[in-house]
Amino acid sequence: MSVQSAIRRKTAPDLRIRKNGEPIVMLTSYHAHTAALVDRHCDAILVGDSLGNVMHGFETTVPVTLEMMILQGCAVMRGSSQALVVVDMPFGSYEGSKEQAFQSAVRIMKETLCGAVKLEGGARMAETVAFLSERGIPVMGHIGLTPQSINTLGSFRAQGREEANWAPIENDARAIAEAGAFSIVIEAVAEPLARKITQSIAVPTIGIGASAACDGQILVLEDMLGLSPRSPKFVRRYGNLGPAIEEAIAGYARDVKSRAFPGPEHVYDMKKS
């Protein structure tokens, strides 16, 4: 048996039992090479529909297709070996009916071999979450700020900053948890509300702009590496790779123009007879 095949990949139940335990570490990845790096340090990798913004330059995640998610999901699965890989269900692939959601989720699971899917929406998606969970598809929920709903929200603004608006968000979390989600992402929600939700539901919460009290945290990899031109308030930059990459490219361009690259060590001599 090879070393790689002996490594056990984390599963949705592994994350589920981390409620009130060691915080869950999660990042996004869309490529095999970044997945290999993330895999060494994270419990889970999200192949997020944020790839629409990060990889393709879309203003929102709305244009992202199922085929795009499957393609990058396959890449991340090939690059990783230990972390649970969760693939986002993109806008338009699951909202029509629970049957539509099932067909889309089956494609994702079969074609990428990932361990779970994620979908946005609260109480209105509870029936769908239950339908998928009962049929062997682990579902990660996503409440609070739901980027796929940008056209009805109007802007990417934090949710629940007035206590009068807490009840619907609390109901969303409760409904998704009771429907069978193994964990729930809470995005851009007022800290006291995120803390309250975490304390009141039985499944792990994973915060992004929520609370340190959540059972885990997730960020977009490119945001925390300093590769994104703009980052949300909730991002802490653990690197500043943008300028470093640009400096390397500029150095390459200088060497090509001056014929300093390639050097003798980079070219092939004739074989000696």
UniProtKB/Swiss-Prot annotation:
GO terms for molecular function: 3-methyl-2-oxobutanoate hydroxymethyltransferase activity; magnesium ion binding. Its cofactor is Mg(2+). The active site is at E187 (proton acceptor). Keywords: Cytoplasm, Magnesium, Metal-binding, Pantothenate biosynthesis, Transferase. This is 3-methyl-2-oxobutanoate hydroxymethyltransferase 3. NCBIfam families: panB, PRK00311.1. Its EC number is 2.1.2.11. Pathway: Cofactor biosynthesis; (R)-pantothenate biosynthesis; (R)-pantoate from 3-methyl-2-oxobutanoate: step 1/2. Mg(2+) binds at D49, D88, E120. Catalyzes the reversible reaction in which hydroxymethyl group from 5,10-methylenetetrahydrofolate is transferred onto alpha-ketoisovalerate to form ketopantoate. One of its GO terms (biological process) is pantothenate biosynthetic process. Homodecamer; pentamer of dimers. The keyword Hydrolase does not apply. 3-methyl-2-oxobutanoate binds at D49, S50, D88, K118. The keyword Chaperone does not apply. CDD domains: KPHMT-like (cd06557).
